[in-house]
Amino acid sequence: MSEFEVNDFGEVVSNAEEMSGAELYADFLGKVEKPKDEFVYYYSKYLSVVNRLTGAATKLHFWLSLNSEVNTGRVFVQSMTQRGALDELKMTVGTYYKALNQLKELGLIKGESAVYYINPAYIWKGTADMRARFLKVYPRL
């Protein structure tokens, strides 16, 4: 059974218990210590895309990544959350949707309406071992 499944609502969920980064990277790096905290990782591939983003799209992408679920990259943007984001990012509704469309067009996020997924090839919030497992199961997210 995979550590990730798609539930009845089309959401990617993790059913993994304890994960060990050392299992995945032992052949390549030797012993790898698991970080004590969760991090938001920005991968070098992201640099090739970030220069093409507008300032609003960059701010929105950072906001979405920081507010995404750990180890899934899923972000819920309900109307209350959207209003909070607009206030926090100092954006108009029109600017928000233009930025959102640019993120989708460049493949940085996927999703519709209130549920989006951060593309783990660029940014990942969580542990590196869960990202590796996620990319193995969903290589084209």
Predicted regions: what is each one?
Residues M1-V77:
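Short recognition helix of helix-turn-helix/winged-helix DNA-binding domains
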Residues T54-G55, L86, K104, M130-F134:
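Acidic/histidine-enriched, beta-strand-rich ligand/metal-binding domains
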Residues W124-L141:
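Short, amphipathic alpha-helical interaction segments positioned at domain boundaries
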Residues G30-P35, L47-V49, Q82, D87-M91, ...:
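N-terminal start-of-chain detector that recognizes signal peptides
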Residues N51, N67-W124:
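Winged helix-turn-helix DNA-binding recognition segment
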Residues E23, F39-Y41, G94, A114-V115, ...:
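Intrinsically disordered, low-complexity segments enriched in small/polar residues
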